C-alpha cells in the first residue's frame, strides 16, 4: 500500500512538473521527487542507509543548484495557485481509492504487515548488522565510491564558483 501511494504521488509530481514555469517551483518539484525516490528505495531494501545516503547526496546537489538559481533568476514573485494544489490533492485521493479498490492484495498485505510488526521485536541484532555489510560489499561499493566522488566534485565546484575576492555571483544593477 505504501509503495503504491509513493508511486502514485511520484507520478502526479511528474505530471505537475510539466506544468511548472518558474525555476523555484521546478526545484521544489525535483526535491519532492528526490524524497519519493529515497522512500521507495528505502522500502525496497532491508535498511534505509542507502536511501539516506542518496537523499543527502541529491539534496546537497540541489542546494548548490538552489543557490545558483536564486542568485541568477530575476526577482519574480513566486505564486502558488490554489486551484492546482486542490486538483493535485483530489487526483491523489482518487488514485489512492482506485488503487485500493482495484488491488485485492492490499488487505492481505496489511494483515501480513501487522503480523510482521508483532514479530519485529524478536529480530536478532546480529542479523540487522549483517544487512549493513551489504552496503560495502563488492557490487555496491562502486555506488558508494561514485557518491563520494560526486560530493567531492560538487565541493570543488562550489569552492571555485564562490570566490570571496570577486564579490557576489550576481551583479546588482
Curated annotation (Swiss-Prot):
GO cellular component: mitochondrial membrane
Transmembrane segments: 24-44, 49-69, 80-100, 139-159
Enzyme class: translocase
Presence of the UniProt keyword NAD in the record: yes
Recorded topology in the membrane: Multi-pass membrane protein
Enzyme Commission number(s) of this protein: 7.1.1.2
Catalyzed reactions: a ubiquinone + NADH + 5 H(+)(in) = a ubiquinol + NAD(+) + 4 H(+)(out)
Molecular function in Gene Ontology: NADH dehydrogenase (ubiquinone) activity
Localization of this protein: Mitochondrion membrane
Primary location recorded for the protein, binned into one broad class: mitochondrion
Keywords per UniProt: Electron transport, Membrane, Mitochondrion, NAD, Respiratory chain, Translocase, Transmembrane, Transmembrane helix, Transport, Ubiquinone
InterPro entries from the UniProt entry: ComplexI_Subunit6
Family named by the database record: Belongs to the complex I subunit 6 family.
Function: Core subunit of the mitochondrial membrane respiratory chain NADH dehydrogenase (Complex I) that is believed to belong to the minimal assembly required for catalysis. Complex I functions in the transfer of electrons from NADH to the respiratory chain. The immediate electron acceptor for the enzyme is believed to be ubiquinone.
Protein's name in the database: NADH-ubiquinone oxidoreductase chain 6
